[in-house]
Amino acid sequence: HSGGAWLAQRLHDDLGLSGACGLLDISLYRDDFDQIGLHTQVMPTQIDFPVAGKHLILVDDVLYTGRTIRAAMNELFDHGRPASIKLVVLIDRGGRQLPISADFTALTVDIPLHENLVLQRNKVGVFALHLENGDATCVTHN
């Protein structure tokens, strides 16, 4: 899974939340197959709880165009109709192509369009944000 899944699990554990924590794989819900093709490693979605009527928190590492969040919400709706969805993101880098905004954002940054911001995690759970196609490390946290 991706940085959003790592971040969601970390927040769930660190905050001592008692509710269930699920993981989405949005590979089949993306709208850019013609640009990137199908992912060969589709991971199973892990939602072992009913979503219908529940207040959900959707967590992602980097909010950019809004298309990943749209895909995640489409998959959630396939599991039921939640009462509400709140969006939590670590980084909002702007550049929206869809009318989606986060309810909670840790950091808002301007990043050139040709750069990708990637959340990485080492074996002991330390997170680092890196710019791909660049040489700067933006943020680290453990």
Question: Predicted regions span which residues?
Answer:
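Charged, well-structured alpha/beta interaction segments
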Residues: 1-12, 66-68, 75
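Conserved nucleotide-binding/hydrolysis micro-motifs of P-loop NTPases
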Residues: 2-3, 27-29, 91-96
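Short, glycine/charge-rich flexible loops or terminal/linker lids adjacent to PRPP-binding catalytic cores
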Residues: 17-56, 70, 98-101
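Structural beta-sheet core signal
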Residues: 23, 58, 87-89
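Extended, charge-rich low-complexity interaction segments
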Residues: 50-63, 114-126
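Internal catalytic or translocation cores that form aromatic/hydrophobic pockets or channels
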Residues: 55-84
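PRPP-dependent phosphoribosyltransferase catalytic core
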Residues: 74-142
